[in-house]
Amino acid sequence: QKDSYVGDEAQSKRGILTLKYPIEHGVVTNWDDMEKIWHHTFYNELRVAPEEHPVLLTEAPLNPKANREKMTQIMFETFNTPAMYVAIQAVLSLYASGRTTGIVLDSGDGVSHTVPIYEGYALPHAILRLDLAGRDLTDYLMKILTERGYTFTTTAEREIVRDIKEKLCYVALDFEQEMATAASSTSLEKSYELPDGQIITIGNERFRCPEALFQPSFLGMETCGIHETAYNSIMKCDVDIRKDLYANTVLSGGTTMFPGIADRMQKEITMLAPSSMKIKIIAPPERKYSVWIGGSILASLSTFQQMWISKQEYDESGPSIVHRKCF
């Protein structure tokens, strides 16, 4: 009997345990739990000794300075890594798509960001954050399924709804038209078998759930949708690079995995942008993992080898070294 379970094992025992997420809105809020996850990752999943390998960590855009220092400190002092580096998630996704200039819409479980990147560097003044992501969509799906008479409340049941979301939801190209289709026929209905064998049917919920990304008012939020947020990010950039951003709009993260999302983004941004502008939305099939893939690319570059923060540099300068070496 262990005092804590991590990852898939925590999920499989979720009925008898309390499930906790140490990362909120993309930023680590519980360092003790985060340390447990890292420990589990090194020793149980990767089965590598962290003191024998350099470690590349990723962070949310606009991650607080104290957080970057804390990550650095834990890696060197708790795990004794010989070297480490912290890279911004969206930048790695862009690398994974084979680009160094573009705008990344990165949407995961807790937060979404639009990050304009020029020649490999994120432009901090133009980064926008949207506290609307996968977990909010799961909660919203729980809510609208309740209206249909299906109740999901516990942390275990939330995970079932997350699975329904991942398997059956999609983004409509034209929301009003899709609602009309759903009302007049059963062509959009799908059934889903719950773990206890009960079968539920869902219809317009399939596209109403991710529609909240484009219409946050569905969640009672007074904020711009992902399309407008991306547009606003582009408009905060120098006029000379906007053309490159419009033509290289890259989707990344699990919450961009809904079928139909790229076509809808194309349509919405085309409506916002200048009329002659070439707009291209890039949605790589592996975008759920593109941050990891980009990290793998970065860490294997010969030019990157002098970028690592070494244990020696850390011992000389302390955690603040991260701001001088990782930007």
Curated annotation (Swiss-Prot):
It catalyses: ATP + H2O = ADP + phosphate + H(+). Actins are highly conserved proteins that are involved in various types of cell motility and are ubiquitously expressed in all eukaryotic cells. One of its GO terms (molecular function) is hydrolase activity. It comes from Artemia sp. (Brine shrimp). Keywords: ATP-binding, Cytoplasm, Cytoskeleton, Hydrolase, Nucleotide-binding. Gene3D superfamilies: 3.30.420.40, Actin, Chain A, domain 4. It is an enzyme of class 3 (hydrolase). There are at least 4 actin isoforms expressed during artemia development. Its EC number is 3.6.4.-. SMART domains: ACTIN. GO terms for cellular component: cytoplasm; cytoskeleton. Belongs to the actin family. Signal peptide: none annotated. It is found in: Cytoplasm, Cytoskeleton. SUPFAM superfamilies: Actin-like ATPase domain (SSF53067). InterPro entries: Actin, Actin/actin-like_CS, Actin_CS, ATPase_NBD. CDD domains: ASKHA_NBD_actin. Disulfide bonds: none annotated. This is Actin, clone 302.
